[in-house]
């Protein structure tokens, strides 16, 4: 597999799959995507059902809006991003390990595996408008926060697979195997 750091929309033509990572804040990230000309290309990528994986802020950018800023999101997934509730027994930012609670079929989480523990660092969580887009949650106080979403060939995780040790590597391995097998839509 060949990896490429794509900073120009013209480079997308040569890609079979795309990872949208993100660290930082919603508005500056969206402004960077706008200034690089990537916004319409990312929307088209999803519309054409090409494989896309968002990570951390990359998950949040897929949604229509965020309480963290005023710039509209990509709108690839319907819903919004809101700050984690302050009234919980949890600290914000939510930092640490949490066990995924699968909600829907997703290529990253085979049914045969025990739900993994993964590492989170975030203060905001996505609220998908369509329940079918919610692939997994994680406990946050007495409630649950979105941990993974999946729609067609677009998926994303709020946690950091690269900081999640073997579990994170296994999730990325499942995504690569899914790509190699033809990126079939989840059943």
Predicted segments — roles?
Residues 15:
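An anion/phosphate-binding loop that grips the pyrophosphate of nucleotide cofactors and donors
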Residues 64-142:
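Pocket-forming structural segment of enzyme catalytic cores
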Residues 19-21, 156:
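Structural motif
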Residues 115, 150-155:
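Beta-strand-turn-beta hairpins that frame and shape the catalytic cleft
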Residues 2-9:
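A short beta-strand-loop structural module common to alpha/beta enzyme folds
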Residues 154-187:
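Acyltransferase
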Residues 24-97:
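Cysteine-nucleophile active-site neighborhood
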Residues 143-150:
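Short, surface-exposed beta-strand/loop micro-motifs that present aromatic residues
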């Amino acid at each position: 597999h060949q990896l490429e750091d794509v900073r120009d929309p013209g480079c997308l033509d040569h890609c079979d799959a795309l990872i949208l990572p993100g660290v930082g804040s919603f508005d500056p990230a969206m402004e960077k995507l706008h200034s690089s000309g990537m916004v319409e290309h990312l929307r088209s990528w999803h519309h054409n059902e090409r494989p896309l994986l968002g990570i951390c802020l990359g998950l949040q950018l897929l949604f229509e809006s965020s309480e963290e800023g005023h710039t509209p999101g990509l709108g690839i997934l319907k819903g919004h991003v809101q700050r984690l509730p302050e009234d919980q027994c949890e600290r914000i930012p939510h930092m640490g390990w949490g066990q995924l609670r699968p909600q829907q079929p997703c290529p990253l989480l085979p049914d045969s595996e025990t739900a993994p523990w993964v590492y989170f660092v975030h203060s905001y969580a996505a609220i998908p408008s369509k329940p079918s887009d919610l692939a997994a949650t994680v406990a946050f106080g007495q409630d649950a926060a979105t941990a993974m979403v999946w729609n067609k060939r677009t998926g994303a995780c709020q946690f950091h697979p690269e900081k999640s040790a073997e579990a994170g590597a296994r999730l990325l391995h499942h995504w690569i195997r899914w790509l190699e097998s033809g990126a079939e839509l989840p059943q």
